[in-house]
Amino acid sequence: MATFTDAEIDELFETSGTVIDNIITAQGKSAETVGRSAIPHGKTKALSAAWEKHGSIQPPASQDTPDRQDRSDKQPSTPEQATPHDSPPATSADQPPTQATDEAVDTQLRTGASNSLLLMLDKLSNKSSNAKKGLWSSPQEGNHQRPTQQQGSQPSRGNSQERPQNQVKAAPGNQGTDANTAYHGQWEESQLSAGATPHALRSRQSQDNTLVSADHVQPPVDFVQAMMSMMEAISQRVSKVDYQLDLVLKQTSSIPMMRSEIQQLKTSVAVMEANLGMMKILDPGCANVSSLSDLRAVARSHPVLVSGPGDPSPYVTQGGEMALNKLSQPVPHPSELIKSATACGPDIGVEKDTVRALIMSRPMHPSSSAKLLSKLDAAGSIEEIRKIKRLALNG
């Protein structure tokens, strides 16, 4: 096993401290993020306090090792010595609790600037590991997102497990300086979880393996069911309205036919009114009456039976009898009450009087009515009188 002298050990301490300071103070390209910072919510204040504490501890560290700074200026660091990237990382499970961290602060004051810097990096890695655990255990979007995050973090763990094996093969003699290399692995892990900081190198991992917080994922839509039920109700109402509209259309399809029938009825009623206006109900006993006033005048003339004392001698026969008619009127000659039995037939005179009254009441031209009256006077049979009557009605 190789042995180192005190001077070589001092050189190793000086070189590792210089490399760590160069890494911290290097102005590299900041890690790129898409949309929002990769720093977990609520960790900004803790990180700022840690950097302020580191700034307050840094000056005494530079005062304790002035000779190491001079040696580092004379001897540049070799690639074999500056191999902190292959150091084994310390996981969150290997970190001491809070009381152990307080004891480490006391030892940091005794061991110098390097151990104080590494202890500060240990605290940052603890906070970043706790932030990762909080993201893995938060039930934001269900079980289907957790396997994706765990699968994305498996390649990074595999890389961190391969690095300690390479480091052991390359530098088996770094038994006394295992704290330097181990804690630098934690600093590299904290860089990957903390995101873009003013003095952090760009993460070597791809963005596909970076853990993403699910805080800003859109929540599930709770009102979709209500919208679906509302749409179903609306569709049912629309179907009912459509059915009722079909019924209305069926009823309205018969409206044109009804209109035509109503028009025909109106025409028929008009014709009937015209015919009734041209026709008159004639009194058979008053055929020559053509107006209501004339009919009333005829109705006033009626026989009157005078009772009381009178001279009945003109009506008394030789046998002392008096003949009375149907109206109980005395008849001077009883033979008038006896009528000869003749053949019953239409009375031509009455028919002529009826047709004459009809011709005179019709609104006809005077020449036409005169011709009909002359024909009526010349008619000698019932058939001729009926023909003249038809001509008068047809106008």
From Swiss-Prot:
**Keyword set includes Manganese:** no
Q: How does it assemble?
A: Homotetramer. Interacts (via multimerization domain) with polymerase L; this interaction forms the polymerase L-P complex. Interacts (via N-terminus) with N0 (via Ncore); this interaction allows P to chaperon N0 to avoid N polymerization before encapsidation. Interacts (via C-terminus) with N-RNA template; this interaction positions the polymerase on the template for both transcription and replication.
- Quote the entry's note on domains: The N-terminus consists of a long intrinsically disordered tail. The central part contains the coiled-coil multimerization domain (PMD). Forms a four-stranded coiled coil structure. The C-terminus constitutes the alpha-helical domain that binds to the nucleocapsid (N-RNA complex).
One Gene Ontology biological process:
negative stranded viral RNA transcription
Q: Where is this region: Multimerization?
A: 222-285
Start-end of Polar residues biased regions: 89-101, 129-180, 203-212
Q: What's the short name of a Pfam family annotated to this entry?
A: Soyouz_module
Ranges of biased composition (kind: Basic and acidic residues): 65-74
Translocase: present as a keyword of the record? no
Keywords from UniProt, A to Z, are:
Phosphoprotein, Viral RNA replication
From which domain of life does this come?
Answer: Viruses
Q: What is this protein called?
A: Phosphoprotein
